[in-house]
Amino acid sequence: MTEITETAEAQAALLSAALPYMQRYENKTVVIKYGGHAMGDIALGRAFARDVALLKQSGVNPIVVHGGGPQIGDMLKRMGIESKFEGGLRVTDQKTVEIVEMVLAGSINKEIVALINAEGEWAIGLCGKDGNMVFAEKARKTVVDPDSNIERVLDLGFVGEPVEVDRTLLDLLARSEMIPVLAPVAPGRDGYTYNINADTFAGAIAGAVKASRLLFLTDVPGVLDRDKKLINELTVSQARALIKDGTISGGMIPKVETCIEAIQRGVEGVVILNGKTAHSVLLELFTEHGAGTLIVP
């Protein structure tokens, strides 16, 4: 047997092993939050686009939600606007939100659409404004002063929280074989435009469409235990316990809390996985052991 034949047989075996998982997700909706290091790496970006295209070809209905914090910061710097933060969160004034919308719904969104279209699929770029898909209201964030222990309200400007999601447009796109690529910008009933955290936006979308899976592509392998080993699966109650005992800490806390909120909205399972691994989406959905931490009810 030649080396070429052995390689071909190995590839065929991988495809055969993936079949039951493809059947499991056929006609199911998978929401993917695309962000982190993968967005700044050309090779990883192309691998991600190919994963999304393969999902669609396999009968899955993928919906992509993307972030863009670093790109927003770069654009603000180029335009001579200083980035301001309160309690670790970006303050978004009127001028800043216009730039945020330009970067997210314009530049980044269309780059992702182009990558997916280059793989032979039909992707379409949208934001919460399109089809009145998402309405937001001003986010209410509070912090506790460590010295006085007094809670104060942060004014983050035009930072919003999604409060209404209409799935009508997403359902139409699913039936038309198109792949929605969503930027986390949405209008408020007050007429203003709001910048929404991409994780929160993805969770709201996934809950509205009752997604089978919500995938968060991050810069870490998933949730780690105290020995820094990957935890393959957690229930909501187990995740809460790990937050309480400090095993889950720092920036992973809001990520896991968003996962829990999505499950409470009707998502069947949420996965935190490493977007720096090429084809991590396919590894998670179409292999036996997955690629990250799955959180279930």
Curated annotation (Swiss-Prot):
One of its GO terms (cellular component) is cytoplasm. It is an enzyme of class 2 (transferase). CDD domains: AAK_NAGK-C. Substrate binds at residues 68-69, 90, 195. It catalyses: N-acetyl-L-glutamate + ATP = N-acetyl-L-glutamyl 5-phosphate + ADP. One of its GO terms (biological process) is arginine biosynthetic process via ornithine. Belongs to the acetylglutamate kinase family. ArgB subfamily. This is Acetylglutamate kinase. The gene is argB.
